[in-house]
Amino acid sequence: MTIAAVVSDPNTHLKTPLMDPKLVPIMAALDPDLLIGLPAKITADTGIDALTHAVEAYISRNATPETQAYSVAAIKLIFRYLPKAVAQGGDIEARYKMAMASYYAGLAFTKASLGYVHAFAHNLGARYGLPHGMANGLALLPVLKFSLPEIEDELRTLAEKTNINTKDKPSAEHFLEQIASLYDAIGIEKCTTAIKQDDIEDLVDLILKEAHWNYPVPKFMNSEECARLLIEISA
């Protein structure tokens, strides 16, 4: 139900994103019964993919009040129901709410697009066979922290609108902490040993080529900054 698809080439170890309105279906059926039995790890990874869709769409330079409303709806559902869907896979309400979260996030990024996190995820996934949601999880917090000077207001607003409980006034840092807490709750990795030092220069070129060609990012990243984030992820 989104405008995007990705083609993986096992010979070149590349993933190519495709975007065309013809990919958008006339109708999508969200049946939570089909999700019962989905393993906890895949539930967690795909949930983080949906979270990444929503967050990247919210901070996109193409964001609108409509797309940001869809992003907020998705993020609120994910924070509340993803831990339950992971821990209690047979919970039909949690499965339904996560299906709706994925739907809302898809509506958001179809119109507002994505960002550096997906450029990292596509290329780490293609090179090393990492699951897409896991790769998004590796890149999401580092990219948000890199972009923070340009997106602090947006993340503060997300902290407020997603009802994060804090003793102080909600801040961008509170939103980042909420994501980190979600990672801990559902077992999402924050770093990987898969990245090879000899691959970093090539990965930087591929990541920046994809992001700068396709995505309306809030803060541009140069080669040195991209390499530092890859090293951080591989620590």
Regions found by a protein language model. Name each.
Residues 36-38, 57-61, 85, 105, ...:
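Alpha-helix C-capping/helix-to-loop hinge sites
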Residues 38-40, 62-67, 141-143, 163-167, ...:
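A ubiquitous short alpha-helical element
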Residues 51-55, 98-106, 120, 140, ...:
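Short alpha-helical scaffolding segments that buttress acidic/His motifs in well-ordered protein cores
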Residues 69-73, 77, 97-100, 119-122, ...:
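Amphipathic alpha-helical interaction segments
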Residues 112-174, 180:
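C-terminal catalytic subdomain
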